[in-house]
C-alpha cells in the first residue's frame, strides 16, 4: 500500500500468530511469515469509502499521490517477488519514503519477526504443534 509520498510492500501468509510457532525450527530457514494484517493491523481498519473506490488514475488526477511513489513501490515489489521465486529473499517488509529519500526493510530473522509478532525467538524456533 502507499500514501502520498510513502508506501510499503509486505509479504506473509500466516494469518494467526499461533501459526508462527516453529517457523524457524530449521536454523537459517523460515517456513512462514506473518501476514500483512499481523504486521500492520492498521491495514485492516476500514478506510474512508471515497479513498477505497479511487483508481490509481483517479488518485493521480486528484493529486493524492506523488508522481513517483507507484513506480518505487512497484519496483520494490518486483524485486521481492523475483527474490522469493529464486530462493534468495531476505526481507519480508520494505518501506519507501520519497519525501525524505529513505528506504528500509525488515529482514527474515527470528529477532525481527519475533519483534513484529510480539513473541520471543524461542517461540519461533520451538517445535510446532499440530
Description of each model-found segment:
Residues 1-130:
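Glycine-rich phosphate/adenylate-binding loop
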Amino acid at each position: 500500500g502507499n500514501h502520498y509520498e510513502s508506501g510499503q510492500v509486505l509479504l506473509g501468509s500466516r494469518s494467526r500468530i499461533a501459526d508462527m510457532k516453529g517457523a524457524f525450527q530449521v536454523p537459517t530457514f523460515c517456513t512462514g511469515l506473518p501476514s500483512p494484517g499481523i504486521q500492520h493491523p492498521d491495514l485492516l481498519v476500514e478506510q474512508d469509502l471515497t479513498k477505497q473506490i479511487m483508481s490509481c488514475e483517479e488518485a493521480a488526477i486528484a493529486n493524492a499521490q506523488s508522481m513517483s511513489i507507484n513506480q518505487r513501490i512497484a519496483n520494490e515489489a518486483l524485486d521481492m517477488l523475483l527474490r522469493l521465486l529464486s530462493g534468495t529473499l531476505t526481507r519480508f517488509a520494505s518501506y519507501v519514503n520519497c519525501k525524505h529519500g529513505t528506504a528500509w526493510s525488515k529482514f527474515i530473522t527470528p529477532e525481527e519477526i519475533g519483534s513484529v509478532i510480539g513473541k520471543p525467538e524461542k517461540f519461533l524456533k520451538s517445535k510446532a504443534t499440530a
